[in-house]
Amino acid sequence: MKKNIKKEITFICTDNVERQCCEPVAKEAERRGYKIKFTENKFEHCEIGFYLSHWNFPKNSKLSVVTLHDLGQQHGEWPVMWKIEFWNIFDIALLPNKEWTDMWHNASCYKCSRPRIGAFFTGFPKADRIATQEFSEKCKKIISEYGIDVTKKSVLYAPSWEWDGRQLEMIEAVKKLNVHLLIKQFPATPDVFPEQYKIISEMHKKSLGKPNVYTLDSSTNIYDALNLSDVLVSEESSTLYEAMLMDKPVIAVTDWLVPDVNPPRLPEFPYDFAVKIPKKDLAETIKKVLSDKEYVKKIKEYRLENFPNLGNASKNIMDIIDCIVYKKEFPKTKIPELPLKKMPKQMKASVAKRKLVLAKYKFAHTSKFGEFIFKLYQFLKWRNR
């Protein structure tokens, strides 16, 4: 057990998505008398450090806590995503649902997955706001701000990436359906995601003036957007999981390419609760899903089975942190670990490769010489485009 931990939590958030995951926990922590702080500095010196990124450096935290910012996080690396996101460098890990709990338990035989104190099944804190009065008020505000007619059904388009003019494909797909189309794009910024920022801006310009089309501010919390909709359309975005948490049917388009590699790849979404279709069937499928209540029933059954802690994650998380601060016994939500065993050769190679990447990142961001080399590399890369 850790000794003499002060009631001070620093949330290390590198973007708005991570911050939205942390905010319910921060509110619960404040309610319990903790001092809280938000920072983008991955190397911040902390009493209690709360981490959600793909790249984490918790060495400067007296007590380090890690969780997921995305229910589909690193899905290309399942079932052992911990070979590239090491949890053994943390004290505590938090799991959002039954499936993640089972996946972690099965991977707990590998050292890279095992935090020093343990892993706990707590729930997904980002979804806690669904049960708040603030949530209802925010949705009313959005309806008023955009002038949305709530008597019409709404389709939400929220992709992980905008590519190949698919926003215009969505507008075309719904134009004869007598529905609203709500558009919620990823909050790309010109400095971090310049290409996506440019593409999204161009799509928004081409969408101006289209009837029954509402382009939401990209910083809008996804749960607010989902609350206004009756069905979600995406490809492999985490919004597909988040829609499920609100009992909203989801449509995953299987031939919308994802440009996170070159050449762009087909999307991956490993869950059966989504209706998976090619883009040519969009209009027909949206119409069918909106008229058939069985889709909602199926989603709700899945949610009830896998997310029993919905709305209580922040309380569960703070109960665990309180146990350490006040030196109390842990709750029964601690997940049992399997006996340790050696990693397969291929997994060892992934771990070694990731460690090298992390070392380079740390060098580039914690020394003046490293920062100079990193900026020079970025400049040369930009010049030779």
Q: Where are the predicted features?
A:
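Active-site and donor-binding regions of nucleotide-sugar-utilizing enzymes
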Residues: 7-140
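Conserved catalytic-core segment of nucleotide-activated headgroup transferases in glycan assembly
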Residues: 11, 18-28, 122-203, 309-315
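Structural alpha-helical scaffold elements that stabilize or flank donor/cofactor-binding regions
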Residues: 42-43, 83-86, 173, 224-225, ...
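Hydrophobic/aromatic beta-strand patches that form the interior of the parallel beta-sheet core
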Residues: 50, 65-66, 92-94, 120, ...
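A donor-sugar binding/catalytic signature common to diverse glycosyltransferases
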Residues: 62-68, 219-262
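Catalytic binding pocket for nucleotide-activated donors in carbohydrate/polymer assembly enzymes
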Residues: 87-90, 109-116, 238-308
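Nucleotide-activated donor-binding/catalytic signature segment of Leloir-type glycosyltransferases, i.e.
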Residues: 197-218
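C-terminal amphipathic helix plus adjacent low-complexity
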Residues: 283-385
